[in-house]
Amino acid sequence: MGEFLSMSIPERGYLLSPVLPVQDIGILYAPRGIGKTFAALSIAVAVASGGAVFNWRAPMPKRTLYVDGEMPATSMQNRLSALVNGMSIPPHTLKNMALITPDLQPCPMPDLSTAGGQAMIEPFLKDVDMVVLDNIATLCRTGKENESQSWQTMQAWLLELRRRGMTVLLIHHAGKSGDQRGTSARKDIMDTVSVCAGPGNTA
Protein backbone atom coordinates (compact mmCIF):
# COMPACT_ATOMS: atom_id res chain seq x y z
CA MET A 1 0.00 0.00 0.00
CA GLY A 2 2.83 2.37 0.79
CA GLU A 3 4.29 1.81 -2.67
CA PHE A 4 0.95 2.61 -4.28
CA LEU A 5 0.48 5.76 -2.22
CA SER A 6 3.94 6.97 -3.19
CA MET A 7 3.42 6.41 -6.92
CA SER A 8 3.37 9.47 -9.18
CA ILE A 9 0.03 9.10 -11.00
CA PRO A 10 -0.78 11.98 -13.37
CA GLU A 11 -4.08 13.80 -13.07
CA ARG A 12 -6.58 12.72 -15.72
CA GLY A 13 -7.43 16.17 -17.03
CA TYR A 14 -10.37 16.78 -19.37
CA LEU A 15 -11.33 16.08 -22.94
CA LEU A 16 -14.16 18.59 -22.51
CA SER A 17 -13.87 20.78 -19.43
CA PRO A 18 -15.41 20.58 -16.90
CA VAL A 19 -17.75 17.69 -17.78
CA LEU A 20 -15.87 14.97 -19.65
CA PRO A 21 -12.63 13.73 -18.06
CA VAL A 22 -9.88 11.77 -19.73
CA GLN A 23 -10.24 8.00 -19.17
CA ASP A 24 -13.94 8.23 -18.31
CA ILE A 25 -16.97 6.01 -18.92
CA GLY A 26 -20.14 8.03 -19.31
CA ILE A 27 -23.72 7.61 -20.43
CA LEU A 28 -26.01 10.23 -21.96
CA TYR A 29 -29.69 9.30 -22.16
CA ALA A 30 -32.98 10.96 -23.02
CA PRO A 31 -36.44 10.19 -24.41
CA ARG A 32 -36.79 9.80 -28.16
CA GLY A 33 -36.71 13.07 -30.09
CA ILE A 34 -35.06 15.21 -27.41
CA GLY A 35 -31.73 15.50 -29.23
CA LYS A 36 -29.39 12.81 -27.91
CA THR A 37 -27.56 12.37 -31.20
CA PHE A 38 -27.29 16.13 -31.73
CA ALA A 39 -25.76 16.51 -28.27
CA ALA A 40 -23.42 13.55 -28.78
CA LEU A 41 -22.25 14.79 -32.18
CA SER A 42 -21.71 18.27 -30.75
CA ILE A 43 -19.52 16.84 -27.99
CA ALA A 44 -17.57 14.66 -30.44
CA VAL A 45 -16.95 17.56 -32.84
CA ALA A 46 -15.81 19.83 -30.00
CA VAL A 47 -13.39 17.22 -28.64
CA ALA A 48 -12.01 16.35 -32.08
CA SER A 49 -11.50 19.97 -33.09
CA GLY A 50 -10.42 21.42 -29.76
CA GLY A 51 -13.50 23.63 -29.84
CA ALA A 52 -16.32 24.51 -27.47
CA VAL A 53 -19.96 23.51 -27.06
CA PHE A 54 -22.63 24.26 -24.42
CA ASN A 55 -20.12 26.52 -22.58
CA TRP A 56 -17.73 23.56 -22.27
CA ARG A 57 -14.31 23.70 -23.92
CA ALA A 58 -11.90 21.07 -25.16
CA PRO A 59 -8.38 22.03 -24.01
CA MET A 60 -6.88 20.53 -27.16
CA PRO A 61 -7.96 18.41 -30.17
CA LYS A 62 -8.25 14.70 -29.43
CA ARG A 63 -8.76 11.68 -31.67
CA THR A 64 -12.40 10.68 -31.63
CA LEU A 65 -14.30 7.69 -33.05
CA TYR A 66 -18.07 8.06 -33.48
CA VAL A 67 -19.93 4.76 -33.95
CA ASP A 68 -23.48 5.30 -35.21
CA GLY A 69 -25.84 2.35 -35.00
CA GLU A 70 -28.93 3.46 -36.89
CA MET A 71 -28.90 6.72 -38.84
CA PRO A 72 -29.07 6.82 -42.66
CA ALA A 73 -25.78 8.08 -44.09
CA THR A 74 -27.42 11.05 -45.81
CA SER A 75 -29.07 12.15 -42.55
CA MET A 76 -25.80 11.84 -40.68
CA GLN A 77 -24.00 13.86 -43.36
CA ASN A 78 -26.63 16.61 -43.23
CA ARG A 79 -26.54 16.78 -39.43
CA LEU A 80 -22.77 16.90 -39.26
CA SER A 81 -22.56 19.53 -41.98
CA ALA A 82 -25.10 21.76 -40.23
CA LEU A 83 -23.37 21.22 -36.91
CA VAL A 84 -19.89 22.06 -38.17
CA ASN A 85 -21.20 25.18 -39.93
CA GLY A 86 -23.19 26.24 -36.88
CA MET A 87 -20.20 25.82 -34.57
CA SER A 88 -17.98 27.74 -37.04
CA ILE A 89 -15.44 24.94 -37.10
CA PRO A 90 -13.10 24.77 -40.11
CA PRO A 91 -13.62 21.31 -41.69
CA HIS A 92 -9.88 20.59 -41.76
CA THR A 93 -9.80 20.59 -37.95
CA LEU A 94 -12.00 17.48 -37.98
CA LYS A 95 -9.15 15.28 -39.20
CA ASN A 96 -9.16 13.84 -35.67
CA MET A 97 -12.72 12.51 -35.99
CA ALA A 98 -13.61 9.19 -37.61
CA LEU A 99 -17.15 7.97 -38.24
CA ILE A 100 -18.60 4.49 -38.61
CA THR A 101 -22.20 4.53 -39.86
CA PRO A 102 -24.31 1.56 -41.04
CA ASP A 103 -25.06 2.51 -44.66
CA LEU A 104 -21.36 2.74 -45.54
CA GLN A 105 -20.39 -0.67 -44.14
CA PRO A 106 -20.02 -3.84 -46.26
CA CYS A 107 -21.84 -5.89 -43.61
CA PRO A 108 -24.25 -5.33 -40.70
CA MET A 109 -22.99 -3.29 -37.76
CA PRO A 110 -21.20 -5.38 -35.13
CA ASP A 111 -22.98 -6.43 -31.95
CA LEU A 112 -20.79 -4.84 -29.29
CA SER A 113 -22.32 -6.92 -26.52
CA THR A 114 -20.36 -9.89 -27.92
CA ALA A 115 -16.63 -10.53 -27.99
CA GLY A 116 -16.83 -11.02 -31.75
CA GLY A 117 -18.46 -7.63 -32.29
CA GLN A 118 -15.90 -5.93 -30.09
CA ALA A 119 -13.10 -7.55 -32.08
CA MET A 120 -14.56 -6.06 -35.29
CA ILE A 121 -14.26 -2.55 -33.84
CA GLU A 122 -10.76 -3.06 -32.47
CA PRO A 123 -8.85 -2.01 -35.65
CA PHE A 124 -10.54 1.40 -35.48
CA LEU A 125 -9.47 2.03 -31.87
CA LYS A 126 -5.76 2.52 -32.52
CA ASP A 127 -4.59 5.80 -30.96
CA VAL A 128 -8.19 6.88 -30.23
CA ASP A 129 -8.80 9.12 -27.19
CA MET A 130 -12.61 9.05 -27.15
CA VAL A 131 -15.23 6.62 -28.44
CA VAL A 132 -18.90 7.59 -28.78
CA LEU A 133 -21.34 4.66 -29.11
CA ASP A 134 -24.71 5.83 -30.45
CA ASN A 135 -26.68 3.95 -29.25
CA ILE A 136 -26.84 1.02 -26.83
CA ALA A 137 -30.10 -0.35 -28.26
CA THR A 138 -28.74 -0.73 -31.80
CA LEU A 139 -25.11 -1.59 -31.02
CA CYS A 140 -25.67 -4.02 -28.11
CA ARG A 141 -28.19 -6.56 -29.34
CA THR A 142 -27.46 -9.78 -27.43
CA GLY A 143 -29.46 -10.72 -24.35
CA LYS A 144 -32.42 -9.08 -22.64
CA GLU A 145 -32.14 -5.36 -21.97
CA ASN A 146 -33.51 -5.66 -18.43
CA GLU A 147 -31.12 -8.42 -17.31
CA SER A 148 -27.80 -7.41 -15.78
CA GLN A 149 -26.12 -10.61 -16.97
CA SER A 150 -26.53 -9.56 -20.60
CA TRP A 151 -24.48 -6.42 -19.83
CA GLN A 152 -21.46 -8.20 -18.34
CA THR A 153 -19.52 -8.72 -21.59
CA MET A 154 -20.04 -5.09 -22.56
CA GLN A 155 -19.10 -3.90 -19.08
CA ALA A 156 -15.82 -5.82 -19.14
CA TRP A 157 -14.97 -4.30 -22.54
CA LEU A 158 -15.74 -0.76 -21.39
CA LEU A 159 -13.48 -1.20 -18.36
CA GLU A 160 -10.73 -2.49 -20.66
CA LEU A 161 -11.06 0.53 -22.94
CA ARG A 162 -10.80 2.82 -19.93
CA ARG A 163 -7.76 0.91 -18.69
CA ARG A 164 -6.18 1.60 -22.07
CA GLY A 165 -6.71 5.32 -21.55
CA MET A 166 -9.85 5.91 -23.61
CA THR A 167 -12.95 7.87 -22.70
CA VAL A 168 -16.19 6.16 -23.76
CA LEU A 169 -19.52 7.98 -24.08
CA LEU A 170 -22.59 5.76 -24.51
CA ILE A 171 -25.87 7.11 -25.87
CA HIS A 172 -29.09 5.48 -24.71
CA HIS A 173 -32.87 5.87 -24.58
CA ALA A 174 -34.82 6.80 -21.47
CA GLY A 175 -37.56 4.45 -20.29
CA LYS A 176 -41.11 5.32 -19.24
CA SER A 177 -39.89 6.24 -15.75
CA GLY A 178 -37.49 8.81 -17.18
CA ASP A 179 -34.43 6.83 -16.11
CA GLN A 180 -32.16 5.07 -18.61
CA ARG A 181 -33.95 2.12 -20.20
CA GLY A 182 -33.11 -1.43 -19.12
CA THR A 183 -30.93 -2.81 -16.36
CA SER A 184 -29.71 -0.39 -13.70
CA ALA A 185 -26.45 -2.38 -13.62
CA ARG A 186 -25.25 -0.22 -16.54
CA LYS A 187 -24.71 2.67 -14.15
CA ASP A 188 -22.48 0.67 -11.81
CA ILE A 189 -19.28 1.50 -13.71
CA MET A 190 -20.30 4.89 -15.06
CA ASP A 191 -18.14 7.80 -13.98
CA THR A 192 -20.52 10.31 -15.57
CA VAL A 193 -24.31 10.02 -16.00
CA SER A 194 -26.09 12.76 -17.99
CA VAL A 195 -29.66 13.22 -19.16
CA CYS A 196 -30.98 15.47 -21.93
CA ALA A 197 -34.16 17.25 -20.87
CA GLY A 198 -36.66 18.97 -23.13
CA PRO A 199 -37.49 22.69 -22.98
CA GLY A 200 -38.89 23.65 -19.58
CA ASN A 201 -37.85 20.33 -18.04
CA THR A 202 -34.95 20.46 -15.60
CA ALA A 203 -35.14 16.80 -14.56
Question: Across the structure, where does each feature detected by a protein language model lie?
Answer:
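Surface-exposed alpha-helical segments enriched in charged/polar residues
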Residues: 45, 49, 81, 122-126, ...
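Post-Walker A helix-loop "phosphate-sensing" segment adjacent to the P-loop in P-loop NTPases
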Residues: 46-61
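N-terminal pre-Walker A segment at the start of P-loop NTPase domains
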Residues: 1-15
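Pre-Walker A (Motif I) flank of P-loop NTPase domains
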Residues: 22-26, 62
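Conserved inter-motif catalytic segment of the P-loop NTP-binding fold
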Residues: 10, 16, 32, 59-145
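Conserved RecA-like P-loop NTPase ATPase core
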Residues: 20, 44, 66, 134, ...
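Hydrophobic positions on the alpha1 helix immediately C-terminal to the Walker A/P-loop
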Residues: 39, 43
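Phosphate-binding/switch region of NTP-binding enzymes
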Residues: 27-28, 33, 38, 130, ...
